[in-house]
Amino acid sequence: YIRVVNGLLIYILLGIGLNIVIGYAGLLDLGFVAFYAVGAYTYGLLASPQLDLHLPFLLIVVIAALAGMITGILLGIPVLKLRGDYLAIVTLGFGEIIRIVINNMDWLTGGPQGIARLDKASIAGIEFTRPVEIYWLLLVVVVLAAVIVWRLEHSILGKAWAAIREDQDAARGIGINTTRAKLAAFATSATIGSIAGVIFAASQRFVSPESFTLQESVLIVLMIVIVVPVALGLAIL
């Protein structure tokens, strides 16, 4: 049952990340699974015989977080002026493009076969291999993410997100830099999603495109729309 709990914690972490763009900023992102994949494949490439680098776990987390943030900004820039259904369609397409690219880059990602024999996650000599050890790692990360996002929600940036969610034109009219606020939402959300991907890959010690399908993306969105309408506290519950 610990494996089931671990799966739930990963979805909670993903929900916390996606809630930034959907719940706080009111931006319907249907391609969030792409950032999840970026994190997972960052770990898959840097902690396996695939590139034979075998970097330390924490270093990979940092690299994956940066990769996720950059990917989030790259997605955010072309969709800045899109809203509603148009935004949803473009982000959905982005998520599918990432999956298709991963699926077809056999020479790097292993294609449909994925990447196996990933290194064990280890911090300061402590290995996280058994489900109960992964559970504690996930719990710490989820709590940290929840606290950070809660602080952001009550910051000036969080108030800017709320204003954009209520009325983007009015927010711009009162002097809020909506471009910067939106990019910050995408970047922060993508960073958390990417970190979730790293832990997922480390816990499975295997990663493949099948874990990042459209259905997975929709499931994460449903978690936000149904389970966590706006409040971060509901996401944790």
Q: Can you describe what each PLM-predicted range is?
A:
Residues 1-237:
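Transmembrane alpha-helices and adjacent helix-loop boundaries
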